[in-house]
Amino acid sequence: LASKQNYYAAYADVLMQLHQREPANAHDAAALQASERARARSLLDILAEARADIRQGVDPTLLDRERTMQQQLNAKADRLTQLLSGQPTEDQTITAKKELDRLLIQYREIQSQIRTSSPKYAALTQPGPLSLKEIQQQVLDEDSVLLEYALGEQRGFLWLVTPASIKSFELPKRAEVEATARRFYELVTAHRAVKFETKHERQARLAKATAEYSEAARALSDMLLGPVAAELQKKRLLIVADGALQYVPFAALPKPGIRDQGSGISTLRIADCGSRIEESPIPNPQSPIGCPLIVDHEIVNLPSASVLAALRRELAGRKPAAKTVVVLADPVFSQNDERINRRGAEQSAIRHPPSAIERSAEESGIEREGPGFPRLAYTRREAETIMALVPEGKGMKALDFQASRARATSPDLGQYRLIHFATHAILNNQHPALSGIVLSLVDERGQPQDGFLRLHDLYNLNLSADLVVLSACQTALGKEIKGEGLVGLTRGFMYAGAARVVASLWKVNDEATAELMRRFYQGMLRDGRRPAAALRAAQVSMWKEKRWSAPFYWAGFVLQGEWR
């Protein structure tokens, strides 16, 4: 059970097993805190691979002791798990847990020393995992509930936290949850173009996907939300996902059924498809599901509950950025691009072996015709639409060659409240360190240049952004579906100073993206909505229109971070 990821995931499982034996002893609250620590540890592994320079000022001896203690904790957690799987006596259970607690105290002492010697490192890797009471007081309000998921090889868990209570539920094992999530993901993204597919083949594939969609969506909704259906009402949902669930568009899931306590069978309680956005909305007959979750709920994703509390501490009292928005869009990826000075391009047309960025693109499922990246035609319109909403002198538009890595790493970005990247963003789950944003790969003369904003680059940025938008993310769900690519990128921007990040879970149709972004930015800049509320309003409005009703066109965009 104790995997490479870390000891805390194993410890959470142990505590939940103890909770089943001793439900009055608050083991479920301790397990939630362990789950929060596990997420901080997972991020550290990503950053180590990315070679992000975050360990400056930390005594190497302390880091060695930290690693040694983690190994001891892993071994002890394994032994305790084996013990609990049998028929241990009460004395055996108490003794084993005391040994584990003793090691945990020593581990926390080492972490405290690291925190003292390097506050920056500690703030990132140990974001002060909150107790249950702290989560309730610092993260939640009366209109919000926290849903935190943890997947394990033998079983998974869901914690539902309100300002006044905690409830915990056992979920199926990781393999079962991920198989259900994968099926839903494949069906919701079926509208994606498939290379070399004929019109007839596409029509047949879409018809099959549409026929299977409702059943798959209902199955996943029942699995993930069924146990808590009666608790959700119309509250804001703060979702801390795990593994494959990071790529589940919760916004598109149908409202969950109310679980029948007697039979265990989940049935759908007939409910109106209401919304606070409009007084009398009606269900969309064109939609493959009757009433998606987004209609009744604002949905916010979080790397962890503790990260949000840390974000709020970092942002408290920060002076607002002076300017409104900067948009980097429609970069130049290829020496064959029509925007290049042809003479200079011919002189530099040298064959290069596949670069690390191109290999990462292949791992992330980006369809490419030959070397290079496809131009995203509608990103230019996307940029123009956003800029039309901005007062003169309060925005900047960086198109073509100006949409460069140099521009993205410039201190000038710190002047803007909203930062929008309308270009390929790679979420690489096989090698999270290779996640990043693709900007102009050639200059005006056609000379190759470094245009990849890498994960470790983000940790050196100094932003004052209320929001960073990545409107064209792309990923591939490999055999092992993990969320490290998404977590690394969004957490990196938060570390750099962004209060929230909007990213896409798949490459959405260019035209649909431009349309959704138009509605999203109108909601923020014209109507004065908070980003989370503006995104929800844009998604609901897309769902209600026949042309855009399929969740593929709107559900892939998720907001991570602060919702206020």
What is each of the regions a protein language model found here?
Residues 38, 147, 158, 237-239, ...:
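Residue-level detector of buried hydrophobic side-chain packing
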Residues 138-141, 150-152, 231-233, 317-322, ...:
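Extracellular/periplasmic catalytic domains that process cell-envelope and extracellular macromolecules
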Residues 233-236, 322-323, 393, 414-418, ...:
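Loop/turn elements at helix/coil->beta-strand transitions in domains of secreted/extracellular proteins
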Residues 273, 314-319, 324, 511-564:
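An often Trp-containing, charged/polar helix-loop segment at the C-terminal end
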